[in-house]
């Protein structure tokens, strides 16, 4: 399955972020 890169809009599909979490409608990377 495809997944979204960090910074991608995820408002409609919050579970598809690659190694990231959907926050404020955008994928935010969990690694800093």
Curated annotation (Swiss-Prot):
Give the tissue specificity: Expressed by the venom duct.
Keyword set includes Disulfide bond: yes
Cellular localization per UniProt: Secreted
Q: Which GO terms describe its molecular function?
A: sodium channel regulator activity; toxin activity
- Tell me, in one coarse class, where this protein mainly resides: secreted
Signal sequence region:
none
Record key words, sorted: Disulfide bond, Hydroxylation, Ion channel impairing toxin, Knottin, Neurotoxin, Presynaptic neurotoxin, Secreted, Toxin, Voltage-gated sodium channel impairing toxin
- Whether Cytoplasm counts among this entry's keywords is no
Listed GO cellular component terms?
Answer: extracellular region; host cell presynaptic membrane
| Residues annotated with 4-hydroxyproline modification | 6, 14
The cysteines joined by S-S bonds are: 3-18, 10-22, 17-27
Task: Report the sequence similarity comment from the record.
Answer: Belongs to the conotoxin O1 superfamily.
Q: Share the domain note from the entry.
A: The presence of a 'disulfide through disulfide knot' structurally defines this protein as a knottin. The cysteine framework is VI/VII (C-C-CC-C-C).
Miscellaneous field: Negative results: does not show activity on rNav1.2/SCN2A, rNav1.3/SCN3A, hNav1.5/SCN5A, Nav1.7/SCN9A, rNav1.8/SCN10A, Kv1.1/KCNA1, Kv1.3/KCNA3, Kv1.4/KCNA4, Kv1.5/KCNA5, hKv11.1/KCNH2/ERG1, shaker and DmNav1/para.
Q: What does this protein do?
A: Delta-conotoxins bind to site 6 of voltage-gated sodium channels (Nav) and inhibit the inactivation process. This toxin acts on Nav1.4/SCN4A and Nav1.6/SCN8A (EC(50)=2.3 uM).
Q: What is this protein called?
A: Delta-conotoxin-like CnVIB
């Amino acid at each position: 399955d495809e997944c979204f890169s960090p910074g991608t809009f995820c408002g409609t599909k919050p579970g598809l972020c690659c190694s990231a979490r959907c926050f404020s409608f955008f994928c935010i990377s969990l690694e800093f």
